[in-house]
Amino acid sequence: MLSKDFEIYYYNDNHFYGVTDHTHDYYEFYFFLEGNVTISIEKEHHHLKPGDMVFIPPGIHHHVSSVGETLPYQRFVFWISQDYCQKLKELSKD
């Protein structure tokens, strides 16, 4: 992450070949909009449908693979650091 707290990105790929298995030290929220991809989380595979949301905690192995190139691969990705997430939790205590 470039920011110390959080980042949000919109991606639109006409040709996506996948990424290798990896982890992060931050939380990842993945909002799937369009495409034909499978996300693998800790070796469990899920074919994504438009509107699906995936939450990936820090340290969890994951990767995305393209199933076909018939549609653009569109998604929002939101990353939030563990420290900032903890600050938000503390602010929302009753």
PLM feature segments, named:
Residues L48-S65:
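Conserved metal-binding segment of the jelly-roll/cupin
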Residues M1-Y10, H61-D94:
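A hydrophobic/aromatic-rich effector-binding and dimerization subdomain
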Residues M1-M53, E90-K93:
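Generic protein-terminus/edge-of-domain signal
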